[in-house]
């Protein structure tokens, strides 16, 4: 195969792109290599088909093949099927990075597919997938010659590192994913990574300096929030690296790009004549529609106005189509919203640019749930419910680049029912948007959780009303729900969604955007954090890029909004009444590892009795003797703990090595200890048990064992064999 290979050196890694040999029937394709990882990216579109709806018909599929890591797919069916959460989130990252590149009016259904064919253990598959997809799109015949590059930045020992290894990321306090093109940033995903510091320094007491003993050593949890200036420094580094990589991509890929296809864009059917008519006759009605907070009501009002115009005498004379009228009404509405903000510095709902909508908070309103918080901000309302469980309740998952499975012990599930926006719709499995919003809230809250123990925490956010910023309402409600559940966190976390309007030299940054401003604005910028700093951020740009000056202004304006919200949340926190009666209890303690076998008992008899008697779940660690007891009743959990400790503190029974004290052929009398389906266990005179098989007891199949011998009865038996401390017995004298 004649492949054209381009090699590009980047910080901490080298990318290799192979063109022209694989997937040649696609409009664009590339075989991407980095280390031992190999990905195939392809781009296809329907040249003869255009969608009529007003959206970009772009689909991105990131697919991981189990064979890429020498694995079989998990589960009963040994074939890849439904994408996992990591695949879905990676598809979203690629989509959000490439979508702004497409021109307005592009209506050809387009699919970008990225397949992982080989995966190195320490591979950052998300950056690789985006860069592979960007290369495939660049060399395709779709006329988009914009070299998007994605990278990750970590912060290790206080220093920023571009494209860190997996091992380095395990020591990082920052996980920053940035994509951009040339000098413009397109998409940002950021979170801080918590760490635990050991405080074993000396402390000063009343009597002077005292050295810390082992019992004085404290483990201090750090959420590692970032200050705005620190984040800007990291983004400047990302921007510099992206600019260099983009230049390398242009130089390498431009000679290989296919000739531009002639693709028809959707025509602009708006009319200046209709626009002027709307301005003169319906401006007031459209402004009234803009102030409607519910999306469904606003949509109905605008449609009614369009129908009214389309049926007017002027429209009939000029032969205006309803579609042209409706599109022009939408255009006028968008420009009216933006002009109101840029010219009058106020918003459709009357707020100032930095003003947050009214907030109302209620906690623990569900009597039988472990904890809950109802967070309402304007016309956006989130009911966040917390459920606490044990280690057994954790979600098991497996990543392609990791050996074995891992456990997710903090889950945030975001649900967006259609009634939240006044619409009727299907109820089904969560979509990509719901997974993405839940993941963002999780990233914002997770660093602040202080102690896990054996606990599993699940937060479910039910969006009951939505008019923008529902994911940030989930963050606020989730932080309060954790407090209402008695979970120790370093601080409250608040989130706020920021917006941007840009026209020529003018721009306006909006705090706490509503749905209308999100739809007609140029940026969706969600930022969450504590009073100390930022814990998570997500940014999507519709402009095709964002300057650092505007980003800096947005970050500091978001800080003001976050501090305002935190003040209200702190007041609500002071009024929380924790429902101790319904919260599950957890006890973690240690016993001698050698006594674990006594807690389990023969065939698990002892531990089963404890579980049933005290209604608890028990997790035992044979290696270090750690015992975890969880249950819904605090008193029963404590009683189970005391019972286990009493067993472990008893004098250990002498365990006999039967091969040392018995020999085959020996005959003796033994007591029938227990009768089971397959025979009877006989207590041996010098310690230990032996099995007398059913075939050595009964004379025919219809005869029952307890018809021949009884528990507690002494019978004469003979040792037939000894194998690995197991004794097989026979009857010394067979009964008549």
Curated annotation (Swiss-Prot):
It catalyses: RNA(n+1) + phosphate = RNA(n) + a ribonucleoside 5'-diphosphate. Keywords: Cytoplasm, Magnesium, Metal-binding, Nucleotidyltransferase, RNA-binding, Transferase. Its EC number is 2.7.7.8. GO terms for biological process: mRNA catabolic process; RNA processing. GO terms for molecular function: 3'-5'-RNA exonuclease activity; magnesium ion binding; polyribonucleotide nucleotidyltransferase activity; RNA binding. Its cofactor is Mg(2+). It is found in: Cytoplasm. Mg(2+) binds at residues 518, 524. Involved in mRNA degradation. Catalyzes the phosphorolysis of single-stranded polyribonucleotides processively in the 3'- to 5'-direction. Belongs to the polyribonucleotide nucleotidyltransferase family. This is Polyribonucleotide nucleotidyltransferase. It comes from Wolinella succinogenes (strain ATCC 29543 / DSM 1740 / CCUG 13145 / JCM 31913 / LMG 7466 / NCTC 11488 / FDC 602W).
